Amino acid sequence: MFLYTENFDEQKEKAMEGLRKALEEDKVDHDIIPLLEKINALQNYFTTSSCSGRISVMEMPHFGDKVNSVWLGKWHREVRLEEVLEAVGKHRSGQLWFLVRSPILHVGARTLEDAVRLLNLAIGLGFKYSNIKSVSHKKLVVEIRSTERMDVPLGENGELWVDEAYIEKIVNLANAQVRRFKGKLKRLEEEIEKLQED
C-alpha cells in the first residue's frame, strides 16, 4: 500500500482544520465554498487550497517578480471599468499589469484511481489544464485548473501606455472569461457527487 493512502485520513483531518481556520478568518473565496464543502464531504477526497479565479491589477518591479509585487486591485468576480481605472491610478513604479487567472483547486485523493476519476471529470467539464500535481509519501494531489488567462502590460514607472477605451475593451474580455470559468465551477459543483462511492 502506498504511504499516501495510509496517511490519507490524517492528511484530510489536518486540511479540514486549516480550512475551518481559513473560513473563520474570511480567507476563502465565498463563491467556491459550496464546491469545497461537496468535495470535502466525499470519503476519498479533500481540498488543500483553492482560488475561484480572479481579475487583478498588479504593480511589479519587473515581470515575474511575484515576491515584491503589489496588488493595486483584486476581484474574484466580474469588475467594473471604474474599479480598474481606480486601481490603475495608484500605479507609481515598476511595471503595471492587468491579469486574469482561472480557478485553481488542489485536491488530495485517497488512491491513484480516485485521482484519475477526479481528473477525468474535471477535464471533461472544461478544466483542460488539470493534472496530478504531486505524488509523495504524504499525499496525492490533483490540481484542477482551467485555460482562462490574460497578462496585459498597461504601463511602467507611472506612465500609462494605453487609453481608457483600450482598458474598457480588456475589462469586457476579462469579464467574459470570468463568466466562463464561474460557469465551469458551477458545473463541477453539480457533477462532483458522481465521485461518491456507492
From Swiss-Prot:
It comes from the Archaea. Disulfide bonds: none annotated. It holds the Pfam family TYW3. The gene is taw3-1. Belongs to the TYW3 family. S-adenosyl-L-methionine-dependent methyltransferase that acts as a component of the wyosine derivatives biosynthesis pathway. This is tRNA(Phe) 7-((3-amino-3-carboxypropyl)-4-demethylwyosine(37)-N(4))-methyltransferase 1. Keywords: Methyltransferase, S-adenosyl-L-methionine, Transferase, tRNA processing. GO terms for biological process: tRNA methylation; wybutosine biosynthetic process. Its EC number is 2.1.1.282. It comes from Thermococcus kodakarensis (strain ATCC BAA-918 / JCM 12380 / KOD1) (Pyrococcus kodakaraensis (strain KOD1)). It is an enzyme of class 2 (transferase). It catalyses: 4-demethyl-7-[(3S)-3-amino-3-carboxypropyl]wyosine(37) in tRNA(Phe) + S-adenosyl-L-methionine = 7-[(3S)-3-amino-3-carboxypropyl]wyosine(37) in tRNA(Phe) + S-adenosyl-L-homocysteine + H(+). GO terms for molecular function: tRNA methyltransferase activity.
